[in-house]
Amino acid sequence: MSEALKERKEMDPQYQWDLTKMYASDAEWEKAFAAIDPKIEALAAWEGKLNNAASIREFYDAEIGVFRELENLAVYTSLRLSEDTRADDAQSMDARATAKYVKAVGTIAYAQPEILALPQETLDAIMDDEQVAPYRFALEDLLRAKPHTLTAPEEKLLAAFGEAFGTPKNVADNLEDADMVFDSVKDGEGNDVELTASNYILLQTSNDRALRKNAFESYYKSFRQHINTLAASYSGAVKTAAAEASVRHYESSRAMSMAGENVPGQVYDNLVATVRKHLPDMYRYVALRKRILGVDELHYYDVYAPLTKGVSAHYTYDQAKQMVLDAVAPLGEEYGTIVRKGFAERWIDVFPNKGKSGGAYSGGSYDSNPYIMCNFTGTLDSVSTIAHEMGHSMHSWFSRHTQPAQYADYTLFVAEVASTVNENLLIEHLLAEKNQDPATRLALLNQYLENFKGTVYRQTMFAEFERDAHAMAERGEALNPAALNNLYKKLIVDYFGPELVVDDEVQYEWARIPHFYRPFYVYKYATGYSTAVALSEGILKNGEPAVKKYLEFLHMGGSAYPLDELRHAGVDLTTPAPVDAALDKFGRILDEAEACVAQLEAAK
């Protein structure tokens, strides 16, 4: 069914990203790396002097310059490492770049506490001085964190542990990407099929149930064999977050995480409560799967299976590019031109190869073009992934070409909005095609339903897992394999309902979710998707006025708080309304899917 993966050097370079635009070679990177130390050390010159507007402006200008260079160094090595996680040179470069970044953070650890220790009248005078105008919002944000900022020596000490704090994630990443081996599996005809981290989800979307079952069991067999290590690494990450929250005088690690973006806890709680209110529609979707697949028992290895047999379209990469371009056409000529530029100038690393990181992401630095890492396999989901990651990249492109470096990075809270708008525009574009037979339309509706399931329901389930795991640690309870497995299994039962048989392997799934090592990130997928539903519907229904507000949002970067940016785009997430409306749409799509099934059944 699937070809054996090639080594990277055997792949066609035209389908690989072009990193020479960052550094012509690793040797050029080494030169830049060797030159950074004196610049980092020079940042210490302002210690004890940040008591007036002129000094603060000079310091921030210098800091931005150094960290732009550090970002280039770190992004390049991260991209190189993604190409082949087994490569010793890339591992070494990435570790060195991380260490240098940690050194720089430690060097400037004095700055925030020094500014925050100033008398209020001095701070007021500084804020009113036009010399700090380019950094006024950043300073306002800093002053908001005053109760949670430590003394200069304490901040420096905490910064020194920065690299060590990343160890739990590094352990899990290296174990899963480089060391874990998955046994090959048999398909329904007895053929051997290679199983990798990159193709696991693809195999779960096969019409071959035996292949799905065998891949599911083999995949989680490896996680079961390493579950003690994975539980220990995750426990370490949770305890690290809890310790920092305590030291910084937050009531919890969740409060610390959300405070960084000025998002109140009610947004998180509204999400969970609203999604739980709509769980009956998820149970209806699970029941529809069971009905269509015609199985006596629906297992977890059935939840990604196509709802229509014989409708398993395969797309070439060229077709995928055109589909994305057609889908984003409503966003205007400039948007489409830049997407074409990305395709033509090799922003994208397209196909899987041995050692390549699984999944997909958009990266890059302020001074580089965006880069997209994906593992394209020709499915509709793969096409959707390109649309998704290009949405991230376009958000970055507009932000970096509009905002100064200090405001170019948008927050994680809004990070999934642009990507999901693109996904929704793609699926709406495909659904708008005329004269679709019920089977083809059902396949598209299934993709839409899967997007909702994966991005709203599933990510909210993850958010509950994360909330409860962190709360357990904060109560002093052990996060051992049994505790984490039981917590996750209960949530699977709650979210998928009575029609799903919960196999033993399901309880290990939490261990494969890398986002758990970025505390309280996953809920933003769900809020982002709900926002994207509102925005994409507005773009398609209202045209230019909605497009204008949306593109303005993409240009804002991190120049305002995320909830304010979304209000500018027309969505208020401090109320349950956007999530409610999104899941009402899920119900309507499900109604149409059920109607397609009825048509197909009547035609038999």
Regions found by a protein language model. Name each.
Residues 1-310, 596-604:
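A well-structured
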Residues 5, 9-11, 20, 24, ...:
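C-terminal, non-catalytic "cap/extension" segments appended to globular domains
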Residues 292-327, 336, 395, 449-455, ...:
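Long, K/E/R/D-enriched contiguous segments that form extended
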Residues 313, 367-387:
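Short pre-active-site segment immediately N-terminal to the catalytic Zn-binding motif
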Residues 371-375, 402-412, 441-451, 470-472, ...:
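Short beta-alpha connecting loops at secondary-structure transitions
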Residues 391-405:
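Catalytic Zn2+-binding segment of zinc metalloproteases
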Residues 410-438, 448-450, 454, 528:
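Post-HExxH zinc-binding segment in Zn-dependent metallohydrolases
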